Amino acid sequence: MFFDSVTNGPEDVMYQVKAACDSDNDPSKIDLGVGTYRNEDGDYHELDVLKEIATVQTISGTGAIHIGAMFLARSATDVLPHVYVGTPTWGNYQPLLRLAGLEMRTYNHYLSQTGRVDFASVLSAIRTTPRGSTFILQGCCHNPTAADFSREQWDIVVAEMESHGHLPFFDIAYQGLGEGVDEDVYGVRLCADKGMEMVVCQSFAKNFGLYGERCGALHVVCTSDDVAARVKDQLRCLIRWEFSSSPAYGARLVNLVLSDARAEEQCLLPLSKTQCQELQNKFRIYAVPNGRITMSGLSQGNIDYAARAIDAVVRSGLEAREPTG
């Protein structure tokens, strides 16, 4: 498989000290090694991860793609040295892949005549490329075309990827800003359900409004916990050599929201039936009572008014004032 031949990375003296301290059961031990802030009990927080997934924090989504590409190029010797990307696409993929020593190959993703995915081209690329190729797949809100796969298309894409032995490399930059938090990662979860190896790059810049905090994550899904441990050790080396560790503040904000039911509900709370009625009565904006809106109803001429109206209703409820401008 793709990652089974990955070996452990070279040891770092700081982590040797940490490993020795962690294995010492003497209650009087004092850890003066790794520079992490701890409480009076000597405890520090580490995010839980599933055993077969090697997860590391990265410097936003760009950092996740960079570290993921470096890992494939340096350590995953069973992965071919080229990556397939549908075009038009995000302009930073090519320099990131080139920097890692990987070649970017392209196929057509978008039909400008219809504004939809060129699905025949996508399937042709998957079916004709060498077995074991890597495909960068944007999970939702395709940049720059906004042409996403439907669920039915995802079913076919994932089945074809599995059949032809390819590695999915997901770029998840807009989760929750497309169809919904769960819907936007349908392709990722489908691969997980099939037990496929994959790389998943996550950004929390846009969906959490944390651009300046550069918060992201890289997940490498492996075939076993032993493989995942070796993969994570290689990721540790890459991060240590390049920027040592990621900033904690943004990650703590994300963790706070996702671990607090009330905070998460506030982030995901849709427009209520009453708020939709208020939009209609006060602002002549019409939406179905469940709060879903059709983006195609917005234009350059009305988007500012609509945004101000929705903001007024959400902030002020039934006392919303008519937006200006």
Curated annotation (Swiss-Prot):
Keywords: Aminotransferase, Pyridoxal phosphate, Transferase
Protein name as catalogued: Aminotransferase tasG
Family statement drawn from the similarity comment of this UniProt entry: Belongs to the class-I pyridoxal-phosphate-dependent aminotransferase family.
Subunit-level organization: Homodimer.
Cofactor(s) named in the record: pyridoxal 5'-phosphate
Pathway where it operates: Secondary metabolite biosynthesis
Source organism per UniProt: Hapsidospora irregularis
Function: Aminotransferase; part of the gene cluster that mediates the biosynthesis of the tetramic acids Sch210971 and Sch210972, potential anti-HIV fungal natural product that contain a decalin core. The PKS module of tasS together with the enoylreductase tasC catalyze the formation of the polyketide unit which is then conjugated to 4-hydroxyl-4-methyl glutamate (HMG) by the condensation domain of the tasS NRPS module.
Enzyme class: transferase
Residues with PTM N6-(pyridoxal phosphate)lysine: 206
EC number(s) recorded for this UniProt protein: 2.6.1.-
